[in-house]
Amino acid sequence: MSGQTTSEYIGHHLQFLKTGDSFWNVHIDTLFFSVLAAIIFLAVFRSVAKKATSGVPGKLQCMVEILVEWINGIVKENFHGPRNVVAPLALTIFCWVFIMNAIDLIPVDFLPQLAGLFGIHYLRAVPTADISATLGMSLCVFALILFYTVKSKGFGGLVKEYTLHPFNHWSLIPVNFVLESVTLLAKPISLAFRLFGNMYAGELIFILIAVMYSANAAIAALGIPLHLAWAIFHILIVTLQAFIFMMLTVVYLSIAYNKAEH
């Protein structure tokens, strides 16, 4: 933080590495760490799959098996349809979002300073603290909601659902369409902003605690236990937000798939 005011330090840490300043710019750091998190997930599961044994499993294999069985049980309980796509999707979402969230536990100055050695002056390492990333994932869930609705009811059923519900009269079709559209759009929007809001707030608190280290000795000493306490608590937030995103995805897809039965 040398040579920077507090506001400059905070502002610097909230700047993305991007391709330009227009609305359509690409956040390179978000893409990089999202892909890195996906590679870590695939590498771990591929390694476990290759070394899987029917004998006494290792610690990592045991942990992965427990995780897979746990998520498969959640999907089985909540999604009453073919699970060959939804169960792997739920596992991928939970692990991917968890890894992206967990990057927030790395000290806030470590990765930006490391990037600075390569001439990169701005870097935000937590993809889920970027609304463009969480909204992108939520739009994919939105597309799957529409897909499973059409799959269970057909395109005609989809049209009827958004024109003749909740008021089954032709004169109220515009009202029905507005009400159902708002309900539908609220799902991906709330999904995106819930994850983004929690992770952005967590990142900002870590930055504010880091600011304390540049103050006098008494405040800097206070920052150490605060940092440790928040990091421990943040482990819960990291895990919980990954679970909530995964769980709501399964629930939304279940509602879309089973609407034909209601």
From Swiss-Prot:
The keyword Cell inner membrane applies. Its main location: membrane. One of its GO terms (biological process) is proton motive force-driven plasma membrane ATP synthesis. It is found in: Cell inner membrane. One of its GO terms (molecular function) is proton-transporting ATP synthase activity, rotational mechanism. The chain crosses the membrane at residues 25-45, 86-106, 130-150, 204-226, 240-260. Disulfide bonds: none annotated. It comes from the Bacteria. One of its GO terms (cellular component) is plasma membrane. It is a multi-pass membrane protein. Keywords: ATP synthesis, Cell inner membrane, Cell membrane, CF(0), Hydrogen ion transport, Ion transport, Membrane, Transmembrane, Transmembrane helix, Transport. InterPro entries: ATP_syn_F0_a_bact/chloroplast (IPR045082), ATP_synth_F0_asu (IPR000568), ATP_synth_F0_asu_AS (IPR023011), F0_ATP_A_sf (IPR035908). F-type ATPases have 2 components, CF(1) - the catalytic core - and CF(0) - the membrane proton channel. CF(1) has five subunits: alpha(3), beta(3), gamma(1), delta(1), epsilon(1). CF(0) has three main subunits: a(1), b(2) and c(9-12). The alpha and beta chains form an alternating ring which encloses part of the gamma chain. CF(1) is attached to CF(0) by a central stalk formed by the gamma and epsilon chains, while a peripheral stalk is formed by the delta and b chains. Key component of the proton channel; it plays a direct role in the translocation of protons across the membrane. PANTHER family: ATP SYNTHASE SUBUNIT A, CHLOROPLASTIC. Belongs to the ATPase A chain family. This is ATP synthase subunit a. It comes from Mannheimia succiniciproducens (strain KCTC 0769BP / MBEL55E). The gene is atpB.
